[in-house]
Amino acid sequence: MQITFVIPKPHGDEDTSFLRIIGANSVPIVWRDISYEYAMERTSNADEYFRFRSGIRYDFTRIGVNDIGCVEFSGIYPSNLFEEIYNYEAVTSVLAHSLEFDIIHSHDWLTYPAGIFAKNISGRPLVIHVHATDYDRSRGRVNPEVYRIEKQGMDSADHIITVSNLTRKSFRTTELEIRRISAYI
């Protein structure tokens, strides 16, 4: 089994002995005409950069990118969190056109838009992971944008993994729908 893990900004000390890590900050979303040598200077893998560049299918010029067409992700939870979520979604579209994969896993609501986009492009099944819903985290003071993202993720998922039966049972679903939801502790 091969695992490809896409993270916003790798730090370089991640354990890659059992998976491949792709830094979203090194995936071009806007075409830039640069030389191979310059790509070598600016990225860890020029061949991969050009492979991903050929996967650009949409116009993301509205998104701020650097000199090689990549988003500079913060790697933290910034004040512009929703902007980072949708920039990550743009990166995922390039990867979905560039990589071979069998399944998409979106770990939490922050990556649901990216997972949904990858599913729509690839036709591959989407599995989402739910730790808690915004309703649970906010004690009923739900952020409408977070709620919308969570709902879209749950509606689009082929399977939902929750961290507990309590979380699983908090979803108001039919018996047929509940078969899509697993609880793992």
Task: Please state what every model-predicted region is.
Residues 4-96:
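A conserved catalytic-core segment of Leloir-type glycosyltransferases
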Residues 84-91, 125-127, 135-152:
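Nucleotide-sugar donor phosphate/pyrophosphate-binding loop at the beta->alpha transition
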Residues 114-115, 171:
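Hydrophobic packing residues within well-ordered alpha-helices of enzyme cores
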Residues 147, 153-182:
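A short, active-site helix/loop in glycosyltransferases that binds the activated sugar's phosphate group
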Residues 93-98, 120, 143-160:
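Membrane-proximal helix-turn-helix segments that form the acceptor-binding/catalytic region
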Residues 103-105, 112, 118-136, 161, ...:
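Active-site proximal beta-strand in glycosyltransferases
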